[in-house]
Each structure stands twice: as C-alpha cells, then as structure tokens.
Amino acid sequence: EHKNNLRDILPDASDKLVSAIQNCEEARKRAEEELEYDIRYGIEPIPMNDDRYPQRLKDCDDAPLILFYKGNANLNQQRVINIVGTRHCTPYGEDLIRRFITDLKQLSPNVLIMSGLAYGVDIVAHRQALANGYETIGVLAHGLDDLYPRQHRETAARMIEQGGLLTEFLTRTNADKINFVRRNRIVAGMSDACIL
C-alpha cells in the first residue's frame, strides 16, 4: 500500500529510491515506538550532545551516539571504576571483592562502581557496592525491556534506586554474544580504572 502511494507521488522513481524511502518510514516508526516505551518506563535517552552523556566515553572513537539510562547516579562522577572478571567467581574472589570495596569506601567514599551485571565477579561487585553505600551502574548487552540474567532482577531493581542500568541498545535487542563485547567498551570507556 505504501509503495503504491509512493508510486503515485513519484511515478518515475527507481525501486531503490522507493525502498530507501520506505526504510526511512520504518526507522521513524521504530524510533517513535522506542520513545513511547522509554517515557512509559522512565528510561532516559541520552544523546552524545547531552550534558548527562558520560564525558569519558565521548573521548572514545567508537562511543555510541545515544545511551538509554534508568537510574539516578551521575554518569560523570569524578571517580569511576569498573570491576570485571570471571563468571565463575570463587569464594576467595568474592572475599577479595568484598574487602576491596569495603576498604575503598574508607579511602574514597564518592566512587561510582560499574560492571556488566553478569554472573560471577560482576554481580558480586554490584552487590558489594550496594552493601557499602556506593552507587553502581550495570551496563547491559541488550535493551532495557529485559534483563539478562533474569536471576539478577532483585539486584537490578536496587541498582536503579542506588545507581542505575545503562545500555546503547534499543528495546527488543537480544543479549547476543557480540553485544557483550560492545557492552565492555562502554564499561571501559567510562572508567578511570579497571579492577580485573
């Protein structure tokens, strides 16, 4: 139907031009759906030209043009560290993270702690940050309409109140393997230091 309308308006247009115009219409519709969802669920789209966009990330060549954020932490906090590692954290690793964050709180109480909300080191870091009164940001490898892994929903809900969830991905984006790699560049790009 749409193609026929375009043919009426542009009878001499090539199939390639008609297809390009239709793709623009589909993209506009998808953007409207995304914004409606974001408004309904309190998600903030933060374009790169917004003051809230992480300044450190702007310095990266492959920084996303837009981020989607749900939370209350300042993404441009003076000190930001990320804590990442294996998805199979040992009791020794858990204790090391707990002691590190507890000691860090004594030395520098205003640090934003970031990770990827994954199993293992990531979730331990987020939970210890919350337990020590730190704001913590989980950078996701999918849209904010879902959560992977689902077992971390309770922690993620607490993080929204004491930090937040951040992604470059639109809703309805699956947690595909390549997205975890893309997610990691945001975690690294926003941080002053990485604890691995």
Model-derived features with residue positions:
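Short, small/acidic-rich helices and loops at N termini and domain boundaries
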Residues: 1-52
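Glycine-biased, small-residue-rich flexible motifs in mid-sequence functional cores and linkers
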Residues: 44-196
